[in-house]
Amino acid sequence: MKPSIVAKLEALHERHEEVQALLGDAATIADQDRFRALSREYAQLSDVSRCFTDWQQVQEDIETAQMMLDDPEMREMAQEELQEAKARAEEMEQQLQVLLLPKDPDDERNAFVEVRAGTGGDEAALFAGDLFRMYSRYAESRRWRVEIMSANEGEHGGYKEVIAKISGEGVYGRLKFESGGHRVQRVPATESQGRIHTSACTVAVMPEVPEAELPDINPGDLRIDTFRSSGAGGQHVNTTDSAIRITHLPTGIVVECQDERSQHKNKAKALSVLGSRIRAAEIAKRQQAEASTRRNLLGSGDRSDRNRTYNFPQGRVTDHRINLTIYRLDEIMEGKLDSLIEPIVQEYQADQLAALADQD
């Protein structure tokens, strides 16, 4: 392992011990805010500190085994122990490097997931419905909660656009790589000649941001329109102008919300989504500037980001960012997404490790 990485690990291990001592101090316990902040820091440092301690122990085992090689009677056993210890050290070094990667503070947050039908008319709206169902099933498997914020249904089913808030542990960290263009190739139910059609949808995933961190929005920059809800919603639909459309004039970002019967609730939801969208756009712009020399696996939610192709006749899904093809389309559409998410998370970590190595 590089000396610069060992030095970083030593500093983090020392800080872990320092924080542990501070947490036992009466003055810290009396100051609840400081105690909470230090408790969080202690939890964040615990894994790396424990792994580093184990790695140091393995280094000692390697030294002991190397010394034993000089003894003819112990040589065979020493060679075996040395081989095992080196393999353990290598495994731990990989773990430590991943633990050293910069954490995205948004990863643990809830997320807004937007699915929009693109080219392909009714078929694109149906596919948007299929994608939303896929994400909902995945959320269910992880015990996350799905709340529809706004839905604009397609004429023959599916959605022209649907926005949902998904709440639970680590939602954004798992779903953030879904942002971008998703393409479907299949024979529509209305196609009499059996021809395969290609349609597209875009997905945008944004972390839900606490109110204190939302960008300041000048009320003068907003145009707020009210209109009557359309689509599913029972007897209360079309009786009042409860639906809200907010346009942020400087950026042109538009958010609609018509899920609630109350105009006030729809407005609050729309403003929450708008704030997250503006922040996401600012972050994407910054990332684009930073990643101009390096590929960026995190999509912007723009249709030009071609993430995946879902080919129904062949039963396959291809992730174009990492050249991965899986022939388990039915499972994936039922929400078994880990086989697609895990490889891209690993690839992203490998890119981060390469960036870390460049810095050193």
UniProtKB/Swiss-Prot annotation:
Signal peptide: none annotated. The modification N5-methylglutamine is found at residue 235. One of its GO terms (cellular component) is cytoplasm. The keyword Transmembrane does not apply. GO terms for molecular function: translation release factor activity, codon specific. Pfam families: PCRF, RF-1. The keyword 4Fe-4S does not apply. Keywords: Cytoplasm, Methylation, Protein biosynthesis. Residues 285-313 are annotated as: Disordered. It comes from the Bacteria. Its main location: cytoplasm. It is found in: Cytoplasm. Gene3D superfamilies: 3.30.160.20, 3.30.70.1660, 6.10.140.1950. Methylated by PrmC. Methylation increases the termination efficiency of RF1. Belongs to the prokaryotic/mitochondrial release factor family. NCBIfam families: prfA (TIGR00019), PRK00591.1 (NF001859). Peptide chain release factor 1 directs the termination of translation in response to the peptide chain termination codons UAG and UAA. This is Peptide chain release factor 1. It comes from Enterobacter sp. (strain 638). The gene is prfA.
